[in-house]
A protein has these predicted regions:
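Conserved HGGG/HGGXW glycine-rich cap/lid loop of the alpha/beta-hydrolase fold
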Residues: 8-59
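Active-site loop/oxyanion-hole signature of alpha/beta-hydrolase fold enzymes
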Residues: 36, 48, 52-86, 211
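Conserved hydrolase catalytic core segment
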Residues: 83-121
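Active-site nucleophile elbow and catalytic-triad environment of alpha/beta-hydrolase enzymes
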Residues: 141-156
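Short beta-strand/loop motif that positions the catalytic acidic residue
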Residues: 160, 166-168
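Conserved alpha/beta-hydrolase "acid-adjacent" motif
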Residues: 173-178
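Catalytic histidine neighborhood in serine/cysteine hydrolases
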Residues: 179-200
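Catalytic active-site module of serine/aspartate enzymes centered on a nucleophile-bearing elbow/loop
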Residues: 196-220
Length: 220
Protein backbone atom coordinates (compact mmCIF):
# COMPACT_ATOMS: atom_id res chain seq x y z
CA UNK A 1 0.00 0.00 0.00
CA UNK A 2 1.09 3.60 -0.58
CA UNK A 3 0.13 6.93 0.91
CA UNK A 4 1.19 10.45 -0.10
CA UNK A 5 1.91 12.78 2.81
CA UNK A 6 2.75 16.37 1.80
CA UNK A 7 4.86 15.26 -1.15
CA UNK A 8 6.43 12.22 0.53
CA UNK A 9 5.18 8.83 -0.64
CA UNK A 10 5.39 6.09 1.99
CA UNK A 11 4.96 2.38 1.45
CA UNK A 12 3.34 0.34 4.21
CA UNK A 13 1.62 -2.96 4.95
CA UNK A 14 -1.57 -3.30 6.98
CA UNK A 15 -2.77 -6.57 8.50
CA UNK A 16 -4.72 -7.95 11.44
CA UNK A 17 -7.56 -6.63 13.59
CA UNK A 18 -7.66 -4.98 16.98
CA UNK A 19 -5.95 -2.03 18.67
CA UNK A 20 -3.48 -0.39 16.26
CA UNK A 21 0.29 -0.88 16.34
CA UNK A 22 2.78 0.96 14.10
CA UNK A 23 6.15 -0.68 13.38
CA UNK A 24 9.21 1.45 12.51
CA UNK A 25 12.40 -0.24 11.26
CA UNK A 26 16.09 0.73 11.51
CA UNK A 27 18.45 2.53 9.12
CA UNK A 28 18.64 1.10 5.60
CA UNK A 29 16.04 -1.58 6.33
CA UNK A 30 12.35 -2.10 5.57
CA UNK A 31 9.22 -3.28 7.37
CA UNK A 32 10.23 -6.85 6.48
CA UNK A 33 12.52 -7.05 9.54
CA UNK A 34 9.31 -7.38 11.57
CA UNK A 35 8.01 -10.42 9.64
CA UNK A 36 8.10 -12.80 12.63
CA UNK A 37 6.86 -10.27 15.21
CA UNK A 38 4.01 -9.16 12.92
CA UNK A 39 2.65 -12.69 12.69
CA UNK A 40 2.19 -12.67 16.46
CA UNK A 41 0.87 -9.11 16.69
CA UNK A 42 -1.82 -9.49 14.01
CA UNK A 43 -3.64 -12.03 16.19
CA UNK A 44 -4.83 -9.18 18.44
CA UNK A 45 -3.86 -5.95 16.68
CA UNK A 46 -4.17 -4.01 13.44
CA UNK A 47 -0.53 -3.70 12.42
CA UNK A 48 0.80 -0.90 10.20
CA UNK A 49 4.37 -1.71 9.15
CA UNK A 50 5.85 1.40 7.53
CA UNK A 51 8.87 1.79 5.25
CA UNK A 52 10.55 5.04 6.33
CA UNK A 53 11.29 7.63 3.62
CA UNK A 54 13.92 6.52 1.12
CA UNK A 55 13.87 2.93 2.40
CA UNK A 56 11.99 -0.21 1.41
CA UNK A 57 9.29 0.78 -1.07
CA UNK A 58 9.05 4.44 0.01
CA UNK A 59 10.09 7.32 -2.22
CA UNK A 60 13.56 8.89 -1.93
CA UNK A 61 13.46 12.40 -0.38
CA UNK A 62 15.79 15.32 -1.07
CA UNK A 63 17.37 14.97 2.36
CA UNK A 64 17.25 12.78 5.46
CA UNK A 65 16.44 14.03 8.95
CA UNK A 66 14.90 12.16 11.86
CA UNK A 67 12.50 15.04 12.53
CA UNK A 68 11.12 14.77 8.98
CA UNK A 69 10.62 11.03 9.48
CA UNK A 70 8.76 11.75 12.72
CA UNK A 71 6.58 14.25 10.87
CA UNK A 72 5.83 11.53 8.29
CA UNK A 73 4.57 9.26 11.08
CA UNK A 74 2.42 12.00 12.63
CA UNK A 75 0.87 12.72 9.21
CA UNK A 76 0.41 8.98 8.63
CA UNK A 77 -1.55 8.66 11.88
CA UNK A 78 -3.71 11.74 11.28
CA UNK A 79 -4.30 11.09 7.56
CA UNK A 80 -5.46 7.51 8.13
CA UNK A 81 -7.29 8.56 11.31
CA UNK A 82 -5.59 5.82 13.32
CA UNK A 83 -6.93 6.07 16.85
CA UNK A 84 -4.28 6.02 19.59
CA UNK A 85 -1.76 3.60 18.09
CA UNK A 86 1.14 2.09 19.95
CA UNK A 87 4.48 2.55 18.19
CA UNK A 88 7.24 -0.06 18.25
CA UNK A 89 10.45 1.48 16.91
CA UNK A 90 13.80 -0.22 16.42
CA UNK A 91 17.11 1.72 16.20
CA UNK A 92 16.33 4.68 13.87
CA UNK A 93 12.68 3.71 14.34
CA UNK A 94 13.16 4.05 18.09
CA UNK A 95 14.56 7.55 17.63
CA UNK A 96 11.54 8.41 15.47
CA UNK A 97 9.16 7.00 18.12
CA UNK A 98 10.76 9.26 20.76
CA UNK A 99 10.43 12.31 18.49
CA UNK A 100 6.77 11.56 17.70
CA UNK A 101 5.96 11.16 21.40
CA UNK A 102 7.87 14.35 22.29
CA UNK A 103 5.89 16.24 19.66
CA UNK A 104 2.44 14.68 20.02
CA UNK A 105 2.00 12.22 22.87
CA UNK A 106 -1.75 12.93 22.63
CA UNK A 107 -1.92 10.91 19.38
CA UNK A 108 -0.50 7.74 20.95
CA UNK A 109 -1.37 5.07 23.49
CA UNK A 110 2.24 3.95 24.12
CA UNK A 111 5.73 3.66 22.64
CA UNK A 112 8.20 0.77 22.70
CA UNK A 113 11.71 2.04 21.97
CA UNK A 114 14.34 -0.56 21.04
CA UNK A 115 18.03 0.33 20.68
CA UNK A 116 17.64 4.11 20.34
CA UNK A 117 20.18 6.86 20.98
CA UNK A 118 19.91 10.57 21.77
CA UNK A 119 22.99 11.54 19.75
CA UNK A 120 25.78 9.86 17.76
CA UNK A 121 27.86 9.92 20.96
CA UNK A 122 25.45 7.34 22.37
CA UNK A 123 26.85 4.70 20.00
CA UNK A 124 29.78 2.63 21.16
CA UNK A 125 33.19 3.23 19.55
CA UNK A 126 33.23 0.20 17.27
CA UNK A 127 29.73 0.94 15.92
CA UNK A 128 30.65 4.55 15.22
CA UNK A 129 33.81 3.47 13.41
CA UNK A 130 31.83 1.01 11.26
CA UNK A 131 29.29 3.69 10.32
CA UNK A 132 32.08 6.14 9.40
CA UNK A 133 33.74 3.44 7.30
CA UNK A 134 30.45 2.69 5.54
CA UNK A 135 29.84 6.37 4.81
CA UNK A 136 33.35 6.76 3.40
CA UNK A 137 32.66 3.80 1.14
CA UNK A 138 29.17 4.64 -0.16
CA UNK A 139 28.59 8.35 0.64
CA UNK A 140 24.95 7.60 1.49
CA UNK A 141 23.07 10.56 3.01
CA UNK A 142 21.05 8.02 4.99
CA UNK A 143 24.25 6.72 6.61
CA UNK A 144 25.53 10.28 7.09
CA UNK A 145 22.39 11.10 9.09
CA UNK A 146 23.51 8.63 11.79
CA UNK A 147 26.82 10.50 12.13
CA UNK A 148 25.25 13.93 12.76
CA UNK A 149 21.83 13.15 14.24
CA UNK A 150 19.78 12.78 16.39
CA UNK A 151 20.32 15.67 18.78
CA UNK A 152 17.80 15.08 21.54
CA UNK A 153 18.45 16.60 24.96
CA UNK A 154 17.31 15.00 28.19
CA UNK A 155 14.81 17.74 29.05
CA UNK A 156 12.95 17.12 25.77
CA UNK A 157 12.31 13.52 26.83
CA UNK A 158 10.29 14.82 29.76
CA UNK A 159 7.62 16.00 27.30
CA UNK A 160 6.71 12.35 26.69
CA UNK A 161 3.47 11.59 28.51
CA UNK A 162 2.51 8.14 27.24
CA UNK A 163 3.48 4.76 28.72
CA UNK A 164 6.98 3.99 27.46
CA UNK A 165 9.04 0.80 27.37
CA UNK A 166 12.78 1.19 26.70
CA UNK A 167 14.54 -1.95 25.43
CA UNK A 168 18.10 -2.87 24.53
CA UNK A 169 20.28 -5.94 24.15
CA UNK A 170 22.94 -6.69 26.76
CA UNK A 171 25.48 -6.62 23.89
CA UNK A 172 23.99 -3.58 22.13
CA UNK A 173 25.85 -1.06 19.98
CA UNK A 174 24.13 1.62 22.06
CA UNK A 175 26.12 2.46 25.18
CA UNK A 176 24.37 1.19 28.35
CA UNK A 177 24.63 4.70 29.84
CA UNK A 178 22.70 6.08 26.84
CA UNK A 179 19.87 3.59 27.33
CA UNK A 180 19.80 4.44 31.06
CA UNK A 181 19.70 8.17 30.26
CA UNK A 182 16.65 7.70 28.02
CA UNK A 183 14.94 5.49 30.62
CA UNK A 184 15.54 7.85 33.55
CA UNK A 185 14.33 10.99 31.75
CA UNK A 186 10.95 9.76 30.52
CA UNK A 187 8.34 10.01 33.28
CA UNK A 188 7.17 6.57 34.41
CA UNK A 189 9.15 4.69 31.76
CA UNK A 190 9.71 0.96 32.08
CA UNK A 191 12.84 -0.82 30.86
CA UNK A 192 13.94 -4.26 29.73
CA UNK A 193 17.39 -5.54 28.78
CA UNK A 194 17.34 -8.68 26.64
CA UNK A 195 19.93 -11.24 27.74
CA UNK A 196 22.40 -12.69 25.20
CA UNK A 197 21.12 -10.16 22.65
CA UNK A 198 22.86 -7.80 20.25
CA UNK A 199 21.51 -4.49 18.95
CA UNK A 200 19.14 -6.24 16.57
CA UNK A 201 18.85 -9.94 17.43
CA UNK A 202 15.75 -9.62 19.64
CA UNK A 203 13.90 -7.52 17.03
CA UNK A 204 14.83 -8.53 13.49
CA UNK A 205 13.08 -11.70 12.29
CA UNK A 206 12.29 -12.50 15.93
CA UNK A 207 9.27 -12.50 18.22
CA UNK A 208 11.33 -12.09 21.42
CA UNK A 209 9.49 -8.81 22.12
CA UNK A 210 6.35 -10.87 22.75
CA UNK A 211 7.90 -11.84 26.09
CA UNK A 212 7.39 -8.25 27.30
CA UNK A 213 4.72 -6.59 25.11
CA UNK A 214 1.53 -8.22 26.49
CA UNK A 215 2.49 -7.36 30.08
CA UNK A 216 3.48 -3.79 29.13
CA UNK A 217 0.23 -3.29 27.23
CA UNK A 218 -1.82 -4.77 30.09
CA UNK A 219 -3.02 -7.68 27.97
CA UNK A 220 -1.98 -10.25 30.58
Amino acid sequence: MYIQLEGQILSYEKDGEGSPVILLHGNGESHEIFDVLSQQLIKNHTVYAIDSRGQGGSATPNSYHYKDMAKDVILFITSLEIEKPSIIGFSDGGVIALLVAMEQSDLLSSIVVCGANLSPKGLNGSALREIKKLYKKNGSPLVQMMLVEPNINESELQKISVPTLICAGDDDMIKPKETEKIFHNIPGAKGHIFKNATHSSYVEHSDALMSVLPVFWGEE
